[in-house]
Amino acid sequence: MKKNIVNKFIGIGLVLPSIFIIIVVITIPIIQSVLLSFQSKDGKYSLENYVHLFSDRSSVNNIIYTLNIVIITVIFTIIFAYLMAMYLRFCKSWFSNAIGKLYLIPKFIPGIVAVYAMMGVINDAGAINRLLLIFGIHFKPSLMYTPQGIILMNLWFNIPFATIIISAALSSIPNSIIESARDVGASKVEIFRRIILPLTAKSALVAITFVFMSNVGSFTTPFLMGSNSPIMLGVSLYQEFGAFYNLQKAAAISVFMFIICSIVGAFYIYSIMKEDKWNIQE
C-alpha cells in the first residue's frame, strides 16, 4: 500500500515540472492575451478591438485573404501528398526510391533560407527568367508579392509533412486487399475511393488539421513574399504589435487566430472520438 502511494507521488512529481512549464509558457500568456484583447488603450474593458477587427474593411480583407490562402494551401497539400504517398507506396523503381529519400529535404532547411532561395528562383529577374533567356524566351513568373507565391512556398513546407502522415497510413494497408480489389475488376479510381481513402481518412484529417493550424499564423513567408495589402493575420499582428505598438488590437488578432485553430482542433477531436465510438459499438 505504501509503495503504491510512493509511486503515485513520484509520478505526480515527474509530471509537475511539465505542467508548470505549460502553465507559465502557454496558459498564462493565453489568459493575458484574452484579457488584453478586451481592453481599450485607456485600460477600460470593452469590445472595441473586436468591433474594429470585424468592421474595419482592411481587417476583414486580411481575414478573408488569410483564410483563402490557408484553405487553398490545405487542399493542394493533401492532393499532392496523396499523389506522392501513393506513388511511393505502389511504384517500385530506382526513381521512386530516390524520391522517397529526397522528399524530406525541405523539412531540414531553415524556413527563412528556403524562402529566400525560392525568391531567387521565382523573382521576375530570378533563376527561371535567366535560364529561359538563354533560349531567347522572356518569361516573368510574376509570383512575387502575390497569393500564388505564398501558396507555392507553403506547399514546399507542408507537402513533406502531409506525405509522411499519409504514407504511414498507406503502409498499413495490406497488399492482399489491393490485389483482391484488382482481381474483381476494380479500377484505380474505385480502389482509391472505396479502399485507400476510407482507410487513410483519419491520417488525412491529422494532416489537414496541422497544416491548417500551422499556416493560419504563419509569418516568415507572407512577410517576405506577400503584398502590402491585404496581408495575412500573422503579419497584421506583427504590425499592430511592433510597428504601431497597439497591444490591444494585436491581442485581439492573436485571440481570433487562437479561436480559429481551436475550432479546427475541436473538429478533429470530435471526428476521432466519433469514429472511436462507432468502433466500440461495432
Go through the PLM ranges and name each one.
Residues N4-N7, Y50-S58, V216, P222-K274:
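Interhelical loop and adjacent transmembrane-helix boundary motif
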Residues P17-I26, I105, T163-I166, P174, ...:
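Transmembrane alpha-helices
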Residues N4, G13-L14, L36, L88, ...:
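C-terminal transmembrane helix and the adjacent membrane-cytosol boundary/short C-terminal tail
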Residues K2-V6, I72-L104, Y116, G120, ...:
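Transmembrane-helix boundary motif in ABC transporter permease subunits
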Residues F20-R57, N61, V121, A125, ...:
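Short membrane-interfacial helix/loop motifs at transmembrane-helix boundaries
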Residues V115-L155, V189, L224-S229:
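Membrane-interfacial helix termini and adjacent extracytoplasmic/periplasmic loops
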Residues K2-F9, P147-G149, I173-V206:
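Amphipathic cytosolic juxtamembrane alpha-helices at the membrane-cytosol interface
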Residues K140-R182, I208:
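Membrane-cytosol interface at the C-terminal ends of specific transmembrane alpha-helices
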